[in-house]
């Protein structure tokens, strides 16, 4: 794709491959990158926010205290991160040291360790890099890529604001460096990737980025940063592990318990009362004597969106009073987010706004999950994930229960 440069008074659009970039822009980005390269360690507060596309309601908004270290010995991400509570800097949430990542689950008093021994068939290590490592990768990409990109520059006397748009046939993410993401099944979305970076002109360092994909939007803002006061030789992430927590390893089979998924089958479905997109409250008890199909879904889930055409047809195929279907969205913060998602995917069926209590009761750990119950609301079948073969499987199960 041929790139072009357009220069306006207050707005500049340029391509990294253009020879006619406004003088000073590329040199300034090199200066910022050089400053980032000088950071051997940093501590800062990090505010992380996420949104669903088309929805202004924030799904996730939390602030952490971060210890970040440059780690050249790690040829994947190239950094160490220790994420703790903003109020208690010893209270660990997450850590990555180049050899493993550790995630703390307080509700289960457990720590999940991933030593990357399980092959995920990915070209990158699935680790979210810390802020300065992440923005460094983006700037390095801008200065060196041969991809088709557009870079918009705005700003004022205090801030240099960049907006990077990547016009490739696959989305580009940054895990230590740029990677073109393999297309997942059922994704028919816009592959355009958009990144924005805000740079403080006093320090010539980034303080915020925003990442926008067709399936997810996120942003991170840092504050109160200090640099190069800590040594990587002193880092021991295991020293932050809370005492008494069970350590488990990614890939190990979990032992079954009274709360395990399999124990739902053959037992009465947990009851619930949830709000529909039209504001009406719906209770499972209202559908006594009906076969009920639930889909637990997420606005950010590609396979969930891919199932919508099938579910639209399904509700038309079984319009009688003996069958009812509900999609329960579990990641939107409010009903307006569910409404926006329903409209965006052209769903012609009922959407309910789920709760954490419902998520826990049905042991939902991934999306989508289908739960089919008989007329007595005994759980008959659970299906995790979606592919074309699921259509006929669900149709056959419903037909059998309606006899």
Where are these regions (language model features)?
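Short, internal strand/loop/helix patches
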Residues: 339-376
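An acidic-aromatic
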Residues: 71-131
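N-terminal leader/targeting segments and the immediate start of mature chains
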Residues: 18-62, 66-70, 75, 144-151
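Extended beta-strand-rich segments in extracellular/periplasmic secretory proteins, especially
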Residues: 132-201
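Thiol-/selenol-based redox modules, centered on thioredoxin-like
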Residues: 372-403
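Non-transmembrane domains of secretory- and envelope-associated proteins
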Residues: 186-193, 202-281, 287
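Conserved redox-active cysteine motifs that mediate thiol-disulfide chemistry
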Residues: 296-313
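Thiol-based oxidoreductase modules, predominantly thioredoxin-like and allied folds used
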Residues: 321-336, 347-356
